[in-house]
Amino acid sequence: MDNIKTNEDALAAIKQKGRALSYVPKELITQELCLVAVNQNGLALEYVPEGLITPEICMVAVKQDGEALEYVPQELKTPELCMEAVNQDAYALGWVPEGLITPELCMVAVKQYGWALSYVPEELRTPELCMVAVKHDGYALRCVPEGLITPELCLVAVKQSRWALSCVPQELKTPELCTVAVKQNGRALEWVPKALKTPEFCLAAVKRDGGALEWVPKELKTPELCLIGWLEQYRVSLDADESPF
């Protein structure tokens, strides 16, 4: 990028790679050039000189990549700009000033990615919002306030993600819930209370995923169960080898 000597060089470079703006000599950087850069890659906003940052440039940047909101000056972060950013990328919620975070904005974010719940202020984590979040990402259960964790919410979460069972309070890990979890993914056996790990339960988990064998109590690892687990893992590896992708 050391060969950027003229306006033409700069324009050609940033049309290919917006973040190449970082290599453009300061005397060649104009608002027009910055607009081209952020239109190609919103994150190029990081390299726009402070004196050239305008509301228009910021809007173009966040529409291209919501996480460009990180580089928007605080005084230019408007409700409209933040909504555009979050619409483009839910994780942009992490760069929204606390005073601009609304229930509507949070709902837009978690409908895209459940884990965006981690950026929602706790006082805005309502039962409805938490349910939407875990429907999209069961592991978002980790971000649900303790007082809002219900059996229904846990059931939705474990149906969506094997990892969700790790976030379920021990007192809510019922045989029924754990059964649903291992049916979704046998490796969820890792977070099943030992008291519930019966021979039948472990067999069901290993049949679902041979890798679950790792979390079967030693005293229940019979030769028959190990064989089933190994055969299941072998079958999966064969399927993977035959996949065209």
Regions found by a protein language model. Give the residues of each.
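Non-catalytic tandem-repeat scaffold regions and their flanking low-complexity/translocation tails
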Residues: 1-245
